[in-house]
């Protein structure tokens, strides 16, 4: 039996499982955990330990059909200006609970399209954030950039405010693919954007691609990757397209009949992995690549890689503070998501209330299962002695789960003499399915994307 046939027999192309960018996954969050928890968690922060800050800008001038992110379209700047004003109000509410001296080791603007902001709004928002949570000495400020919605004045403003890493969404450069997903983005515009970023001193660059898109094939993806390599990014993520039109209504505009079949989709992922590794990148986890001297590659080699809502990260900050509609915070005590609908989020802020509306209070069992899953997703290795050292006797509950994984996913999963579990290189596409065996929560499969 070929490797791909064996993976298919194990259910790789049928399973729908979490991406495990958090544990527990967001569908487990409950309305029983809200703004009071949010306030208490902020008040408990240690000023000596830098935090990460995520700011969500949900607006886009165009809504790409493939996207399942929390976004909304606008053709004018008026709602964006009003929203930035609300972000500033939220920062003031956070400030009321924030211990003096807390600093940001990481700041990330995501969306949506953060570069829909005018230069004036960029300055206004960045300065308001830094007034409440100043940068730590060795900070990273990254921004998601749409090359079709950015110009030199915006890049200059971001650079002046301290942006030192840019994340550029690409998806695919092929015309027929772009037309099929409602996204126009010529390579020439992207190249010009990258050149401008570097001219303004932004030398750390991430690019995001997607495989499994309509009309995508080996030739078109290879051509896209060749162009991406010419841009010389430090990191690349290539995510599998999640076709969930029952959740993301705009995906109904995509013709399902021209989506690549399961096996071809898997081969596209393998092709991308081969081309990027041949291009000098190291493979990171299930869907990221980084140059050998990049901090993410260094973290992966030393088993210090972590998962967060952006995917893989080398961020060592234990706290993620989410600002903006639908943003999610991660505290030592658990997770908290802000109100998702922009209008409801604004109403909460205008009433002087923190906007947290659902979350999850972590238990010691959650920490154990979460760390086991993170090891699987990041290292393809579950270090049982390390779990025993950290969690003590409860770590023994992992033993039957390890045995189940080894039995169910033979020959890709093996158990070492000390009880640790390893996933073979040929079976790493199964990582999310294997991680599911260590998930203590049952949630409907329809909420998740295809495992491959």
UniProtKB/Swiss-Prot annotation:
SMART domains: Elp3. One of its GO terms (biological process) is bacteriochlorophyll biosynthetic process. Binds 1 [4Fe-4S] cluster. The cluster is coordinated with 3 cysteines and an exchangeable S-adenosyl-L-methionine. Keywords: 4Fe-4S, Bacteriochlorophyll biosynthesis, Chlorophyll biosynthesis, Cytoplasm, Iron, Iron-sulfur, Metal-binding, Oxidoreductase, Porphyrin biosynthesis, S-adenosyl-L-methionine. Its EC number is 1.3.98.3. It is found in: Cytoplasm. It is an enzyme of class 1 (oxidoreductase). Residues 45-278 form the Radical SAM core domain. Pathway: Porphyrin-containing compound metabolism; protoporphyrin-IX biosynthesis; protoporphyrinogen-IX from coproporphyrinogen-III (AdoMet route): step 1/1. InterPro entries: Aldolase_TIM, Coprogen_oxidase_HemN, Coproporphyrinogen-III_oxidase, Elp3/MiaA/NifB-like_rSAM, rSAM. One of its GO terms (molecular function) is metal ion binding. S-adenosyl-L-methionine 2 binds at residues 66, 112-113, 171, 183, 208. One of its GO terms (cellular component) is cytoplasm. [4Fe-4S] cluster binds at residues 60, 64, 67. Its main location: cytoplasm. It catalyses: coproporphyrinogen III + 2 S-adenosyl-L-methionine = protoporphyrinogen IX + 2 5'-deoxyadenosine + 2 L-methionine + 2 CO2. Belongs to the anaerobic coproporphyrinogen-III oxidase family. Anaerobic transformation of coproporphyrinogen III into protoporphyrinogen IX. Dedicated to bacteriochlorophyll biosynthesis. This is Coproporphyrinogen III oxidase, anaerobic 1. The gene is hemN.
């Amino acid at each position: 039996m070929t490797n791909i046939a064996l993976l298919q027999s194990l259910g790789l192309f049928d399973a729908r499982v979490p991406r495990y960018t958090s544990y527990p996954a967001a569908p487990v969050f409950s309305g029983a955990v809200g703004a009071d928890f949010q306030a208490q968690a902020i008040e408990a922060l240690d000023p000596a330990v830098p935090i990460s800050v995520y700011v969500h800008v949900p607006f886009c001038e165009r809504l790409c059909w493939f996207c399942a992110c929390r976004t909304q379209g606008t053709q004018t700047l008026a709602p964006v200006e009003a929203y930035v004003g609300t972000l500033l109000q939220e920062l003031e509410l956070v400030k009321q609970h924030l211990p003096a001296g807390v600093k940001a080791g990481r700041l990330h603007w995501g969306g949506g399209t953060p570069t829909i902001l005018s230069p004036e709004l960029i300055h206004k928002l960045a300065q308001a954030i830094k007034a409440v949570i100043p940068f730590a000495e060795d900070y990273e400020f990254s921004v998601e950039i749409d090359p079709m919605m950015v110009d030199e004045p915006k890049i200059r403003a971001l650079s002046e405010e301290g942006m030192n890493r840019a994340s550029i969404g690409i998806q695919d450069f092929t015309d027929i693919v772009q037309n099929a997903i409602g996204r126009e983005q010529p390579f020439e515009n992207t190249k010009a954007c990258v050149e401008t970023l570097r001219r303004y001193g932004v030398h750390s660059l991430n690019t995001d691609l997607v495989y499994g898109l309509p009309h995508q094939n080996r030739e078109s993806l290879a051509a896209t990757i060749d162009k991406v390599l010419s841009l010389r990014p430090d990191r690349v993520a290539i995510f599998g397209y999640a076709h969930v039109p029952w959740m993301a209504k705009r995906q109904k505009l995509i013709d399902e009949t021209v989506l690549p079949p399961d096996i071809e989709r898997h081969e596209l992922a393998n092709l991308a992995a081969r081309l990027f590794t041949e291009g000098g990148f190291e493979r990171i986890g299930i869907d990221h690549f980084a140059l050998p001297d990049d901090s993410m590659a260094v973290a992966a080699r030393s088993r210090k890689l972590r998962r967060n809502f952006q995917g893989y990260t080398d961020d060592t900050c234990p706290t993620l503070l989410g600002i903006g509609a639908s943003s999610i915070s991660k505290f030592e005590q658990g997770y908290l998501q802000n109100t998702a609908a922009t209008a409801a989020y604004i109403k909460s802020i205008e009433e002087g209330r923190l906007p947290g509306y659902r979350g999850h209070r972590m238990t010691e069992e959650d920490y154990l299962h979460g760390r086991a899953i993170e090891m699987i997703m990041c290292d393809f290795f579950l270090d049982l002695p390390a779990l025993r050292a950290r969690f003590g006797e409860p770590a023994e509950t992992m033993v039957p789960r390890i045995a189940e994984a080894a039995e169910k996913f033979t020959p890709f999963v093996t158990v070492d003499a000390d009880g640790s579990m390893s996933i073979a290189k040929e079976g790493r596409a199964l990582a999310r399915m294997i991680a599911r065996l260590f998930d203590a929560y049952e949630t409907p499969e329809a909420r998740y994307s295809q495992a491959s």
